[in-house]
Amino acid sequence: MLQRDMSRRSWTLLLIVAAMWGGSFMLTAIAIRDLAVPVFALLRTGMGALVLLPIALRRGALAGLREQLWPVLLLGVVQLAAPFLLLGFGQRSVPSGLAGILVSSTPLWTALLAVWIDHEERSRGRGLVGLAVGIVGVVLLCGLELSGSLDTLLGGGMLLLGALSYALGGFLGKSRVRGMTPLGAITGAMLGGSVVLAPVAVATLPDRAPGLGPLAAALALGAFSGGLGWLLYYTVLAECGPAKATVALYLVPAFAVVYGVVLLGEPLTAAAIAGLALVVSGSWLAASQGSRETPSATPHERVRPASVAQNR
């Protein structure tokens, strides 16, 4: 096992990534105030693709895309288009901080799906404990935070389905997308997701121009969370290995809650804090039971479940 120490620069980049991805829920809340959800989702994938495409081309990361066109297109639907739509519709009735906590349940869905899809990823020992702890957290949130109205409960269900879609995309990236780097795969998926979303977005274009704030929020979300965030994450991945780099994923819901409370004036309840602690700790246990760092863990490693996508 190769141990890699986290430098101050690596910690800084990791915190920046977590802050960007955590901010995606706040930006979503702002964007959907004045944008149809399909339009918002298209702007998010389109801006991400515009940021990543020149870099992927310069690095030769799209080599093999022609051979993997259909798997990458499917990845774009499952990993990007579907969850972005679900998250957009879900956040219409759920506060951004709570949305961040619910979506952070992705590793729990991964552990559950592994029972049927991938025995190598199946939970054992502390992974099962983490799965149980995380499920308790989700049930707590659904019972205390989402039970106020049918709209809120349905919104929470959409957010959990979005997390499930992220988890499915991880398995899809491992089993179907071969011979491409994570950068190439996520860039191709951004392009594919944009193609799929375009006709739906055109059909839901508003009669009037959207406000500057919501439009800027959607574009910033795509450029920073979708584009720059991934590039910085790959940098941390190269310097520290996957086990340490994934710390960013567990900081995301905390940033989402802070942004929601401080910038959007959302309430912070004891149930939300307890749910955050249970879901994040359970997800960490479920996802880290077999993690190892190897010398080959670089941004150019081939696509694996955690390497393309649980985000953001």
Regions found by a protein language model. Name each.
Residues 19-28, 53-103, 113, 140, ...:
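Specific transmembrane alpha-helical segments of multi-pass solute transporters/efflux pumps
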Residues 52, 73, 105, 113, ...:
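Hydrophobic transmembrane alpha-helices of multi-pass small-molecule transport proteins
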Residues 2-4, 45-46, 143-144, 198, ...:
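C-terminal-most transmembrane helix of multi-pass membrane proteins
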Residues 43, 80, 99-105, 170-195, ...:
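Helix-helix packing/entry segments at the starts of transmembrane helices
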Residues 39-50, 78-79, 84-122, 126, ...:
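Specific alpha-helical transmembrane segments that line the substrate/conduction pathway
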Residues 52, 110-116, 131-134, 148-204, ...:
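Transmembrane alpha-helical segments that form core, pore/gating elements
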Residues 1-42, 89, 148-175, 299-312:
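Glycine-/small-residue-enriched transmembrane alpha-helix faces in small-molecule transporters
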Residues 6-11, 33-42, 64-70, 128, ...:
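Juxtamembrane helix-entry segments on the extracytoplasmic side of multipass membrane proteins
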